[in-house]
Design a protein with these regions (language model features):
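GH16 jelly-roll
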Residues: 19-289
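Bacterial Sec-dependent N-terminal signal peptides
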Residues: 1-29
């Protein structure tokens, strides 16, 4: 009996040992860590994918440019009426000339033009270059800028879908230009817009190249190749901070007066005033090889 009991104990012990070995988790096998995907690097094409060299005469090329029309104040209490007349926007001597005039126009006492490429030149990323000479005088407010082609985000078109101000200039601050971005989270109406300024003493006497570099990770603004403002996209941003992953179109205009341009009043004796544009060129964003 004692031998039988001892045999049973030995068998039970062996069985328990085997069971523990069977239940034990497998020993992990060492593996090399998965390599991180390096961020993509980009550059811009050497040749423009869209351009206007203004090597013709007459109205701006209708295949490339449309007009915003009217005298609604444009959300900024502006004083001009925008028209599509030759007197306010014409091409001659190799340049586009946008002219603000003191004259009765619609319900307003000033006329001007606001050109846009919507539906004719809409871009997602790339580099935009505009070579221009600006008007002068208190009350003028020229701009080179972009807006969203479609309303993709939020409950209202602006500012939810973004604005990129490549160049803004106000006549009461003659030797300086500004670049800004506007989004739902960052915009001037709530005092949170992001931007910068730089001195350009000859802005109204010489031509300068105003440019925007637009990549998935940032937008950067420059004058004559000298960057003076950059706004970076971050992983924490959503569309309210960074709606700039959808197409935008270009606008060129001169406003008169308004909430910013008219802060020091409007000098009635300076008109007509013109912004001359030598060329507009848009380069495509491509991956570096």
């Amino acid at each position: 009996m004692r031998h039988a009991t001892l045999l049973l104990l030995i068998l039970f012990s062996l069985n328990a040992s085997c069971q523990k070995k069977e239940d034990a988790p497998p020993t992990p096998v060492a593996t090399d860590p998965k390599p991180l995907t390096p961020p993509k690097e980009y550059t811009f094409t050497d040749k423009p994918v869209w351009q206007d060299e203004f090597d013709y005469v007459g109205k701006p090329d209708p295949a490339k440019w449309g007009y915003d029309l009217g005298g609604s104040g444009w959300g900024n209490n502006e004083l001009q009426n925008y028209t599509d007349r030759l007197e306010n926007a014409q091409v001659k001597d190799g340049k586009l000339i946008i002219t603000a005039r003191k004259e009765a126009s619609g319900s307003r006492q000033f006329s001007s033009a606001r050109l846009l490429t919507k539906g004719k030149g809409d871009f997602l990323y790339g580099k935009i270059e505009v070579k221009a000479k600006l008007p002068t005088g208190v009350g003028t407010w020229p701009a080179i800028w972009t807006l969203a082609t479609d309303s993709n985000y939020g409950s209202q078109y602006w500012p939810d879908n973004g604005e990129l101000d490549i160049m803004e200039h106000v006549g009461f601050d003659q030797g300086r230009v500004h670049a800004n971005i506007h989004t739902k989270a960052f915009n001037h109406s709530i005092g949170t817009n992001k931007g910068s300024q730089t001195d350009v003493p000859t802005a109204s006497t010489e031509f300068h190249v105003y440019s925007l570099e637009w990549q998935p990770g940032y937008v950067a603004f420059a004058v004559d190749g000298r960057q003076y403002f950059r706004f970076d996209n971050t992983s924490s941003y959503n569309w309210s901070q960074w709606p700039f992953d959808r197409k935008q179109f270009l606008l060129l205009n001169i406003a008169v007066g308004g909430s910013w341009g008219g802060q020091k009043g409007v000098d009635q004796d300076i008109f007509p005033q013109s912004m001359e544009v030598d060329y507009v060129r848009v380069y495509e964003l491509v991956e570096k090889k």
